[in-house]
Regions:
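A structural signal for well-ordered alpha-helices, especially hydrophobic packing surfaces
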Residues: 15, 22-25, 29, 58-61, ...
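A conserved P-loop NTPase coupling/switch region
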Residues: 1-53, 79
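Interdomain "pre-motor" coupling segment immediately N-terminal to P-loop NTPase/helicase cores
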Residues: 46-69
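ATPase nucleotide-binding head domains, primarily ABC-like/P-loop NTPase cores
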Residues: 4, 63-255
Length: 255
């Protein structure tokens, strides 16, 4: 049996006029890319430096623009052990609501270094903790801060236990991650560190969570004048009676 294949006049005409256009385009693109690569390689180090400088300039312009538009103030950086913020604001939260209430913060050897916040859900505890951490961080990167005034002592590390999502791929529950974060903060923190602890102990029973949180806070209090800046929020209303201050008053604790 003989089979004849015939092409319509229109496809034949297109094949004659256009041909293998797409492969030719790809080949031409490849030639251009190879020429560009050959041109760039000798100047790669210079281009990399220029890109980094442009990125830094972009960041500085963005910081300056944000500070000017939102009336940020220049913080005072000191070597003293102090975090003193007057009417601080959360840099993102204040953009989302019209009636944001500023909050002041004082953590120093003369006031207290361990601050515990208690209160109902949605009362602003987490926002306040994040606000403190963000203002301290912004001051350390050379940025103005959202506050009327700020006196920030140099911080060597910021440790946080704020929000945890379980890591199934590594077989770690949210509570296990919480414990590891707290362990890191306790073992690695120094007198110049800032530690933010938000609702630690929710991933286990109420009794165990209360005991763990009290033990962690007591660990910091036992350091006395070496205690870092610690800010804690908790829903455990009875936490005070489990702290060392219940029988041995400490000048470093504030509720």
């Amino acid at each position: 049996m003989t089979i004849f294949l015939s092409m319509d006049i229109k496809p034949t005409e297109l094949d004659r006029l256009i041909g293998d256009t797409h492969p030719e385009i790809l080949a031409h693109e490849m030639r251009i890319m190879m020429r560009l690569t050959k041109f760039i390689l000798p100047h790669l180090e210079t281009l990399s430096t220029v890109i980094k400088l442009c990125a830094q300039l972009d960041c500085l312009i963005a910081i300056a623009k944000t500070c000017k538009e939102n009336d940020y103030k220049r913080p005072v950086i000191t070597t003293d052990k102090i975090i003193d913020i007057t009417n601080g604001r959360h840099p993102l939260q204040e953009l989302c609501i019209n009636n944001y209430v500023p909050n002041s913060t004082k953590s120093s050897m003369d006031s207290s270094l361990v601050t515990i916040l208690t209160g109902p859900n949605s009362s602003g505890k987490s926002i306040y903790l994040k606000q403190v951490a963000l203002i301290v961080y912004m001051a350390h990167i050379g940025c103005f801060v959202p506050a009327e005034a700020a006196n920030i002592g140099l911080i060597d590390h910021i440790y946080t236990r704020v929000q945890t999502v379980e890591d199934i791929s590594n077989r770690m529950s949210a509570f296990l991650i919480d414990l590891r974060q707290m362990s890191l903060a306790i073992q690695e923190s120094s007198t110049k560190s800032l530690i933010i602890i938000d609702e630690f102990g929710k991933g286990t029973s109420e009794l165990d969570g209360l005991a763990l949180l009290a033990a962690c806070i007591n660990n910091f209090l036992f350091r006395e004048d070496k205690v870092p800046h610690v800010f804690v929020s908790t829903h455990f209303q009875t936490i005070a009676q489990y702290l060392v201050t219940s029988y041995m008053p400490s000048p470093y604790l504030n509720f």
